[in-house]
Amino acid sequence: EYDDAHTFRSGTYFDEIYHARTAYEMIHDLYNYENTHPPLGKIFISLGIRIFGMNPFGWRIIGTLFGIGMLPFLYLFGKRLFHQTWVAGVVTTLFAFDFMHFTQTRIATIDVYGTFFIMAMFYFMLRYAQTSFYDTEFKKTLIPLFLSGLMMGLGCASKWTAVYAAA
C-alpha cells in the first residue's frame, strides 16, 4: 500500500525545493524563484523533468548520471597520476561508496554538476601538465588546456564554488 505522506520518495528533499522548482519554472518560462547560482545545473535538472515529468525521479536522474560519470573521470585521473591501475581502481571504488558522493548524487542539488566539471577540469589540467612539449606538436598540447578551461567554465556556470577550484 502506498503512503501519500511527504517523503523523499514523493516530494522534495533539502535544496531540491529550490532547484527542482526553478528547473520547472525554466521549462515553463516562469519567473525563476532561485537565482543565487548560475543556471546550468538547473538546466540539467530540467532535462530530467522534461523527459520523466515533474516527479522525484525526473528531477534526480540527471544528477545521478553525472555522479556515475564522475567515476570514470576519477579512475582516469588516478591512473594518470599514480601510473598504476590497481591504485586507480581502489580510489574509484572508495569514491563510489563514499556516503557524501552517494547522497549528493541521489538528490536534485546543483553540487553534483559543479563537482563533475571540477573533476574534469583537474583531469585535463593534469594531462596538460604531463604533456611532453618536446615530443608533441604545439597545437596538440593546447587541447587538454582548452578542455580544462571549458570544464572550468561549465563548472562556474553550474555553481559558483567552481571558481574556487579554478583559483
Tell where the protein language model's regions lie, with residue ranges:
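Short helix- or helix-capping micro-motifs
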Residues: 91-96, 103, 123, 152, ...
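Membrane-interface transmembrane helices that cradle and orient dolichyl/undecaprenyl
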Residues: 79-82, 121-145
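Alpha-helical transmembrane segments of multi-pass integral membrane proteins
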Residues: 59-66, 91, 110, 155
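Short acidic/glycine- and proline-prone juxtamembrane loop motifs at membrane-interface regions
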Residues: 100-113
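Extracytoplasmic catalytic/substrate-binding loops of multi-pass membrane glycan-assembly enzymes
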Residues: 1-20, 32-44, 54-57
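Transmembrane-helix motifs of polytopic, lipid-linked glycan transferases
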Residues: 61-82, 120-124
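Juxtamembrane segments of multi-pass membrane glycosylation machinery
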Residues: 28-32, 44-65, 84, 99-100
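Transmembrane-embedded, aromatic-rich helix segments that form part
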Residues: 147, 161-167
